[in-house]
């Protein structure tokens, strides 16, 4: 096709927009939302790189998916994992693939799996 230019936004379903706003803004540190349209069920955050993350109000009966995972770039995965733990987030110990990547998984308050990664030593 060749007409796609990149990722604009990745949308994550949540069941409570106020809790989602607090988690993504304060715990993950994305700052104030770019767009806060809670009345429409949508809040969008800048990630600090190309592509944004939005949280959208889920339909009744929604369950989190583990098949699709948002992976966020960080400068140092080990330090970022430790910081998330200090903020009360359950976070896996980082896994290192030497010469390739260090990554760790964690979950938002709604059960959505997220990961972070940094270059491996």
Name each model-derived stretch:
Residues 9, 28, 115:
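Short catalytic micro-motifs in class I SAM-dependent methyltransferases
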Residues 18-32:
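Amphipathic alpha-helical segments
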Residues 16-17, 74-78:
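Helix N-cap motif at beta-to-alpha junctions
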Residues 1-21, 68-70, 120-121:
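N-terminal beta-strand motif that seeds the catalytic metal site of vicinal oxygen chelate
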Residues 31-66, 113-119:
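Conserved short beta-strand elements that form part of the metal-binding/catalytic scaffold
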Residues 9-11, 44, 54, 69-71, ...:
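Short aromatic/hydrophobic contact patches that present stacked aromatics
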Residues 23, 78-83:
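Short amphipathic alpha-helices within nucleic acid-binding modules
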Residues 1-3, 34, 44, 81-121:
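Vicinal oxygen chelate
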């Amino acid at each position: 096709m060749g007409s796609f230019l990149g990722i604009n936004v990745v949308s994550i379903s949540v069941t409570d927009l106020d809790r989602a706003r607090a988690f993504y803004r304060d715990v993950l540190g994305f700052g104030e939302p770019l767009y806060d349209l809670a009345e429409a069920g949508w809040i969008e955050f800048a990630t600090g790189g190309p592509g944004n993350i939005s949280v959208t109000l889920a339909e009744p009966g929604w369950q989190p998916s583990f098949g699709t995972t948002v992976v966020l770039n960080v400068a140092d995965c080990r330090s970022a994992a430790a910081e998330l733990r200090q903020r009360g987030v359950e976070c896996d110990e980082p896994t290192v693939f030497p010469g390739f990547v260090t990554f760790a998984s964690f979950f938002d308050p709604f059960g959505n799996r997220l990961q972070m990664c940094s270059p491996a030593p």
